[in-house]
Amino acid sequence: MRIALDAMGSDNAPSAEIEGIALALDELKDLEVVLVGKPGIVDSETMDGYSGRLELVPAAEVVGMNESPYEVVKRKRNSSMAVCMELLKQGKVSGVVSAGNTGAVMAFALTTLGVVPGVHRPALGALFPTIKGSTLVVDIGANVDTKPLQLLQFGIMGTTAASYLFKKANPSVGLLNIGHEDSKGNELTFNAYQLFKQSEMNFVGNVEGNAILKGTVDVVVCDGFVGNALLKYAEGLAEVLSGLLEQYLEPDSEHRTRRWRRWLSKPVLREFIERMDYQEHGGSLMLGVLGAVVVAHGRSTPRAIKNALRSAATAAQDNLSEHIRHRFAETAPTT
């Protein structure tokens, strides 16, 4: 599987990307990476060390985190982000990963790859760890203002992706709300509930925030404003838990009692905290565009980049965008 990586995207670019590639190529033997960025960012020894599995494609321009997506699409057609999308469009790679400006990644994907026919707005889907495995949450930041039909489409895209990611024939979906009763919520969620209820999806109804960590449903749908706040909270929770664990295990910690140390040292606790870490999931799937695109976190570490490359390879291998296209061609409402 051949994936293009935007070398200039993250806050720590290009070092995080280059180190992440090394981790990915060492672990994923079927992976090939096309690194897109400024010439000379990778030395010849590193290139030669991966026997043709690593290629550098030059791109002179860089998209900044604070730049307007609309402006960069017009002005920076030779940016690393734009070149990645062009490689995917031309079929030279099977997927794209970028830890850059999310709005710009979305804009380049829309203008270069195009949108699945019938999809009003593409959405970002992120895997949240649960006590049962994972839940796919859609949308986590692409659309802060949405309409009921768009939420329904998020559900259709999310359940289609989940059926392949989770290997389930009929994944369940819930609408994130402040209560499980069908009368709860605001005008958006109330009207969306009616659409979900009439759909052919395995709709379980409204779900509250605690349903995500419990793994009550396979897919949770919300608007991007709520979803992004939820994502940042989950990331913060993982960081706090990890920090507390290290603090309590310090040899001179006042909290370090034998009982605490025994409990905190349990492998199951460490495993849970690691699963909560955003680095383990790498990035978010862009659902609704014609291609496999993963948006990684701006502060991605090498481990996060490695896992984002894995996610993109999986999405490409499962052909998620094509399955979503078929689903919308067959059953999805567009008006």
Predicted segments — roles?
Residues 1-5, 11-15, 29-32, 49, ...:
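N-terminal charge/polar-biased segments
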Residues 5-15, 142-152, 295-302:
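Short, glycine-rich nucleotide/cofactor-binding loops
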Residues 6, 35-36, 57, 98-100, ...:
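Short beta-strand segments
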Residues 13-16, 28, 32-40, 144-209, ...:
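Glycine-rich phosphate/diphosphate-binding loop of Rossmann-like nucleotide-binding domains
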Residues 13-67:
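N-terminal glycine-rich anion-binding loop in soluble enzyme alpha/beta folds
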Residues 49-93:
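Phosphate/nucleotide-donor binding subsite
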Residues 110-123, 127-137, 216-220, 224-335:
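Glycine-rich phosphate/nucleotide-binding loop
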